[in-house]
Amino acid sequence: MLTWLNRNSLDFPPLEKALREPNGLLAAGGDLSADRLLNAYRHGCFPWFQDGQPILWWSPDPRTVLFPEELHVSRSLGKMLRQSRYHVTFDRDFASVIKACAAPRSYANETWITGSMQDAYLELHRRGHAHSVEVWDQNELVGGLYGLAMGQLFFGESMFSRADNASKVGFATLVQHLTDWGFVLIDCQMPTQHLHSFGARSIPRQTFADYLSRHLDQPSGADWSYRRV
């Protein structure tokens, strides 16, 4: 039976209560307050729903992750990185990145990044938890991604691209910096061919939960101040 969250409590049910079908549906309801979202990530779940649906919270089993040291950069992407066709910044324009990620795609008219979701993650950004990666072609924003950094873990949310391989350049650059900063895992949530091409793989939900318990409160060397890479 699906658990409905109490607005007066930030607690989530145990991960093992998640449904098998649809895979990982853990709870519904609640709200998108910053405190609830932070507690959700600490607990091992994330919101994902469409306009008109209640807020749905997910913790799939298995979980798709990327270990930074396992990043695979294709020959063509490596060449593009060396050529510095684009330049990359962190936290320069979070609002534009999440808005671009929310825009309808050619293969889907609807977006799960609703207006309320954008507002919620903008608040997390203001609090210093959510971060953006921007990819620029001169002064034009052509790609990027956003997610949360907690301890030694990064929780990826969404990416977009308006130019060839722009999001790939942004993601690869981010992973290289996360490696330097001592991050141990990037949560990719659900499997995609795009993520697998970077070396992402699936691990059991319990293994993912173990990483949370060991690394969420560990310090990292992250420096998200504006930079040009």
Swiss-Prot record:
Pfam families tied to this protein: Leu_Phe_trans
Gene Ontology annotations for the cellular component aspect, listed alphabetically: cytoplasm
Catalytic activity: N-terminal L-lysyl-[protein] + L-leucyl-tRNA(Leu) = N-terminal L-leucyl-L-lysyl-[protein] + tRNA(Leu) + H(+); N-terminal L-arginyl-[protein] + L-leucyl-tRNA(Leu) = N-terminal L-leucyl-L-arginyl-[protein] + tRNA(Leu) + H(+); L-phenylalanyl-tRNA(Phe) + an N-terminal L-alpha-aminoacyl-[protein] = an N-terminal L-phenylalanyl-L-alpha-aminoacyl-[protein] + tRNA(Phe)
Taxon lineage: Bacteria, Pseudomonadati, Pseudomonadota, Gammaproteobacteria, Pseudomonadales
EC number assigned by the record: 2.3.2.6
Keyword terms of this UniProt record: Acyltransferase, Cytoplasm, Transferase
Family membership: Belongs to the L/F-transferase family.
Keyword presence, Calcium: no
Main location: cytoplasm
Gene (name only): aat
Transmembrane spans: none
Molecular function GO terms recorded: leucyl-tRNA--protein transferase activity
Name this protein carries in UniProt: Leucyl/phenylalanyl-tRNA--protein transferase
